[in-house]
Amino acid sequence: MSANKGSAPHQHGVKGVYHGGEWLDMEDCDGVFSNIEEKCSGCKNEGKCPPRSRSRPSANSDGTNYDIVVIGAGCIGAAISRELAKYKLSVLMLEASDDVSQGATKGNSGIVHAGYDDKPGTNHAKFCWTGNQMFPDLDKDLNFGYQKNGSLVLATNKDEVGILEDLLKRGETNGVQNLRIVEKKELFEMEPHINPNVIAALYAPDAGNVIPYEFAIALAENAVDNGVELRIRREVTGITRKDDGLELTVNHWEPKAYILSKEVSPLQKIGTTQLIILGFLASLTLWAGALMNLVPAGAFPKLMGTILAFLVLVKVLFPGKSKVERNTPISELVNQAGAIEGSGGTKVSVDDMKVGGSGCRTIQNGETVETETVKAKFVINCAGSYSDKIANMIGDKSFCIKPRLGDYLLLNRNQGHLTTKTLFPCPDPILGKGVLVQTTLWGNLILGPTARDVYKPEAANMTAAEVQHYILSKCKNLVPSFDPKETIHAFCGARAKSDRGDWIIENSAVDGRMIHVAGIDSPGLAGSPAIALEVVRLLEESGCKLTANPTFNPRRAPIITPKDGMRGLKMGSVGKNDSDGLDEAKMSQNVICKCEKVTELEVVRALRRSLPIDSTQAIRKRTRAGMGHCQGDPANYNCEARVKAIIARETGMPMSQIGGRPWPATSTLSQRWPEESELKDLESRMNE
């Protein structure tokens, strides 16, 4: 059951889980976590592992012609793709970045809003509450973790109480249920740590929260498991209208470091068979020379030995780009991991954020390796902040996306007890909902976001110090007692705000075979499952034949299992507890990330799923390895290097081909592991 009034919130994965919106203690989790994965014995399952930069091809397509192409693999694209997997259709999902959920989905609050704030009659209002009500059942099927914790809009004076009353009426108009205004006495029983000046609040018990990228990953996995094809690192550069559909030109890019690692020198091209032939020919030459007395008899053995030694040396000094062997010790691979980025690096720009942020082509120093042609009967344009550019490719200029930046600060789990509900100030008529204070599913306290329109220089050009001051000072008005020195991470997302002021969910007026799902800003995550149903309806109206897929399986196994402290787990130096990738009992005990207690088995489980993974960042989003207090500090437990080594062992990729966690990405912190002086600066900015 859910947390009691005034009690500290549960932490997902710690002695239990949130499942379908409610809390389950560990002893009640057996039905959720038992038999969660087909037993895998290493290379016996290797044929099921997805190739690089794509899932396994769709059985319903020839690789070029598809019924539907979905552009964008955030929570909207993933939700739509999963819904389409319920039908006998060939579906291709294209993502410009190096993983699913790398755009706005990665950089937001993860709130499943109730829908009381949305203007009646808009798409926001139409789909938010409907989507909200779909989350409990979705989580029961997909196990991404959903907490129905409720939200509170706080009022500090009578004028603001009037705003609460207006919000209550608006919510009821939108069909939102169970809303009520809570007076001060009951409010402080619910939330004893809020600002003592608060006198009332609007309570929405049906609001909840998820980890947004874990939600999108679950949707995408289940879609691919049911036949949808995914290709990552695919930038759509052109769309041509044809009589029989739409033809897309797609650039497949890869990081330059990966391309260089695949290059083979002439000496590396010499294989073992070729060396044997060379050795045989050299021996014949020497033997012939000896017969003709051109080679002294006593020198023959020495010359033969020299030739053989040379051939062996060539193979040792210039090995081919072979796969990493499964029996390579993890300790040996960790030593090859290289330095972990924690300072310097390239800052992510707004243009980068439109196409995947830290996972985009520019930040990854990518180069086109292939240009693909894809044909589709219908195209779903859910490319986030890039969706207006996709529309322009067919001559549709009916909307424009102007990204709005939202900055956040993430605090340690030891601050998570300060609230159980999601806390908002009274909304500003211009700035909207305002900053929030919330305890995440995993127990961290999250503060933010800002609302910086990129077309306003004074907002877009705010310094890191100004952004931090804005967040901390505003959040202090909600919960005065949090400690900013417990900040462990900072990030920013770009909301795809359209010039129409509402979500755009419609057939293109230029060509009805393209359906726009654009400008999906807040509360888009809450509305995503309902939006997916609407897209299916539009497709059917447009002539897309929908026949139920009799083999559709709605279930997806979780990756992370709940833990009771260190019970049954083992920590140690690299190599002490590492397995060979075959002993699942040993892997389930071996802790790879100390702060988050991520096990080797959880990393392996993520790698053996249907989505392509070739970076520690992708594993981080699926298992939380590197997301804890130390943020992957190599001086602590070196978890990022350990994860990189496991990726190499499981996939066979050389360490040089495995991506890491980029820095600084969108952080307002000066380095990944902030020094005491920077944390003290945060404290002073809170009190300025």
Q: Which role fits each region the language model picked out?
A:
Residues 85-106:
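Glycine-rich FAD pyrophosphate-binding loop
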Residues 432, 441-442, 453, 458-591, ...:
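C-terminal catalytic lobe of FAD-dependent flavoproteins
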